């Protein structure tokens, strides 16, 4: 699950609100990322090229929390 993955590097930023979580790749290389949620919600990994802004679900209205952006395996095992 996403909670056991490695945190994305500092150049990958996220902002979260109740509806959306935006993940921005300000790094110079591509990363495969997802978002970790406090309740363990699992969302698919997505590829982020340099400069990309990805949209993931927000924390909702039921007390969930976005813990951060995390890296995914690049070999398809994520």
Curated annotation (Swiss-Prot):
InterPro entries per UniProt: A-amylase_inhib (IPR000833), A-amylase_inhib_sf (IPR036379)
State the SMART domains in the record. Answer: A_amylase_inhib
Ordered alphabetically, the record's keywords are:
Alpha-amylase inhibitor, Disulfide bond
Keyword Transmembrane present in the record's keywords: the answer is: no
**Disulfide bonds listed in the record:** 11-27, 45-72
Which spans are transmembrane here? Answer: none
In terms of Pfam families, this protein maps to:
A_amylase_inhib
- Show the GO MF annotations: alpha-amylase inhibitor activity
The protein's job, in short, is: Inhibits mammalian alpha-amylases specifically but has no action on plant and microbial alpha-amylases.
The name on file for this protein is Alpha-amylase inhibitor Haim-1
The record lists the organism as Streptomyces griseosporeus
Q: What broad taxonomic lineage does this protein's source fall under?
A: Bacteria, Bacillati, Actinomycetota, Actinomycetes, Kitasatosporales
């Amino acid at each position: 699950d996403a909670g056991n993955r490695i945190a994305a590097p500092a150049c990958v930023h996220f902002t979260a609100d109740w509806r959306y979580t935006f993940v921005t790749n300000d790094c110079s290389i591509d990363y495969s990322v997802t978002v970790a949620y406090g309740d363990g919600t699992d969302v698919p990994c997505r590829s982020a090229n340099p400069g990309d802004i990805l949209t993931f679900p927000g924390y909702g209205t039921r007390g969930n929390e976005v813990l951060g952006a995390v890296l995914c395996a690049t070999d398809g095992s994520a």
